[in-house]
């Protein structure tokens, strides 16, 4: 499972992928050291991932 470990004031959610399957299901350029935002709209939850320290502003939705 993806465990939420911290929610910082700007809304970024830090997570830990605790099972290998979770890591395998993430896009190849996303690591377990990434930050994650949960965006819920119209009943759907979208996980937005960004590598820690990535200043490009590029988020990957899964």
Name each region found by the language model.
Residues 1-42:
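Extracellular/surface-exposed low-complexity repeats and stalk/linker segments enriched in Gly/Pro
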Residues 37-62:
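Short, surface-exposed terminal/edge motifs of secreted or surface/virion proteins that either
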């Amino acid at each position: 499972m993806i465990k939420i470990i911290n929610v910082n004031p700007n809304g970024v959610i830090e997570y830990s992928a605790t099972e290998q399957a979770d890591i395998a299901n993430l896009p190849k350029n996303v690591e377990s050291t990434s930050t994650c935002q949960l965006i819920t709209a119209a009943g759907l939850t979208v996980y937005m991932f960004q590598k820690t320290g990535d200043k490009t502003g590029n988020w990957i939705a899964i």
